[in-house]
């Protein structure tokens, strides 16, 4: 990759202080316009206190928004490798580098957080707070890609294997300004479930023919909490080769 931006001035900038690029602002404007067309107003507006998420929220220009900054939405901590190149990471943290490639769910950067850490700590804190204070409300939250992966892991009760499968599939990638819409309302019937059961993904994509950013919207999908029988557990175990 291009390491030219890893200058002394840049690597000493705290992660929370980075602003959006020009492309990032166009993506934020694009998803904001789409979101306003879907739903004019929300009951609560949450945003990570990082500068780039503040800028994203402002650029989205949601009408009458009153944003609440909350640190639970902050970016996943990348610890000691936050501002070093991939080559430096591989050289100076060879063992940790190996686990990053083989175990993206539980892998933790040196002095940083794993996706599982973010899920078990901050995502659960957020959902507990929303269940208590905003159970029947519509909420928009501007956060970061890995936090969104942890949110997906938690809300959909994904197994380790399913998370790993999605991590290897580009179709599940959280690209810049991706919008994950989780709902308790059945999009087909309008009936409300007791728990979140439906999700729709929308993301800005660049249309080469028009030279403009447009939003690509995936179909709604339904998910349910997986419950495994003894036989299901045995099948999972047998799918893994013994190591001893």
Where are these regions (language model features)?
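An N-terminal RHG(E/S)-centered segment typical of histidine phosphatases
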Residues: 1-43, 55-58, 185-244
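Glycine-rich phosphate-binding loop signature in dinucleotide/nucleotide-binding domains
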Residues: 38-41, 130-137
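Generic beta-sheet signal
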Residues: 135-146
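Domain-level recognition of soluble alpha/beta enzyme cores
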Residues: 9, 158-190
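Phosphate-coordination/substrate-recognition cap region in phosphate-metabolizing enzymes
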Residues: 29-98, 168-178
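Short glycine/proline- and acidic residue-enriched helix-loop micro-motifs
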Residues: 16, 96-117, 222-225, 238
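Conserved AMP-binding/adenylate-forming core of the ANL superfamily
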Residues: 20-25, 112, 117, 182
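Generic structural signal for well-ordered alpha-helical scaffold segments
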Residues: 29-36, 119, 123-131
């Amino acid at each position: 990759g291009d390491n030219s931006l890893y200058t002394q001035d840049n690597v000493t900038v705290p992660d929370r202080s980075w602003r959006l690029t020009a492309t990032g602002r166009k993506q934020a404007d694009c998803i904001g316009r789409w979101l306003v067309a879907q739903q004019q107003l929300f009951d609560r507006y949450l945003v990570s206190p990082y500068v780039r998420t503040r800028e994203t929220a402002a650029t989205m220009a949601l009408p009458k928004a009153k944003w609440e900054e909350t640190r639970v939405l902050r970016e996943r901590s990348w610890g000691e490798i936050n501002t070093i190149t991939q080559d430096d990471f591989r050289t100076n943290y060879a063992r940790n580098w190996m686990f990053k490639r083989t175990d993206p769910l539980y892998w933790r950067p040196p002095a940083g957080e794993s996706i599982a850490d973010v899920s078990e700590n901050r995502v659960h804190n957020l959902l507990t707070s929303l269940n208590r204070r905003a159970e029947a409300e519509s909420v928009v939250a501007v956060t970061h890609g890995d936090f969104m992966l942890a949110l997906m892991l938690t809300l959909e009760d994904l197994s380790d294997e399913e998370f790993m499968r999605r991590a290897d599939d580009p179709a599940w990638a959280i690209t810049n300004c991706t919008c994950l819409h989780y709902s308790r309302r059945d999009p087909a019937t309008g009936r409300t479930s007791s728990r979140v059961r439906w999700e729709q993904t929308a993301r800005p994509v660049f249309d080469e023919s028009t030279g403009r950013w447009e939003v690509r919207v995936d179909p709604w999908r339904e998910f349910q909490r997986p419950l495994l029988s003894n036989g299901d557990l045995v099948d999972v175990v047998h799918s893994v080769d013994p190591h001893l």
